[in-house]
Amino acid sequence: MSPLAHLLALPVRAYRLIFSPWVGYNCRYQPTCSAYALEALQKHGGLIGAWLTLRRILRCHPWGKCGYDPVPERTRKP
């Protein structure tokens, strides 16, 4: 993971550690949005991983879809 991806993963890990047990596991998608964010940052790095995470969070609302929504694979070689 790039240094930017590590930095962007800190708030996600803090959310999972502090807030997620209190608010419950209510994500409409599988994997959960926080797991998706960490996987996207790991696979795609800071910029693209953050973009994918933002798009996913914007899709996760009561009137949106639900179900299996994996992180897309990288299309280019690193």
From Swiss-Prot:
Q: Which Pfam families match?
A: YidD (PF01809)
Q: Which InterPro entries match?
A: Membr_insert_effic_factor_YidD
Which keywords has UniProt assigned to this entry? Cell inner membrane, Cell membrane, Membrane
What topology in the membrane does the UniProt record assign? Peripheral membrane protein
Would the keyword Transmembrane helix turn up in this protein's UniProt record?
no
> In which compartments does the protein localize?
Cell inner membrane
Q: Which GO terms describe its cellular component?
A: plasma membrane
Give the principal location in a single coarse category: membrane
- Describe the task this protein carries out: Could be involved in insertion of integral membrane proteins into the membrane.
Task: Give the UniProt family note.
Answer: Belongs to the UPF0161 family.
Please report the name of this protein according to its UniProt entry. Putative membrane protein insertion efficiency factor
Which species is this record about?
A: Roseobacter denitrificans (strain ATCC 33942 / OCh 114)
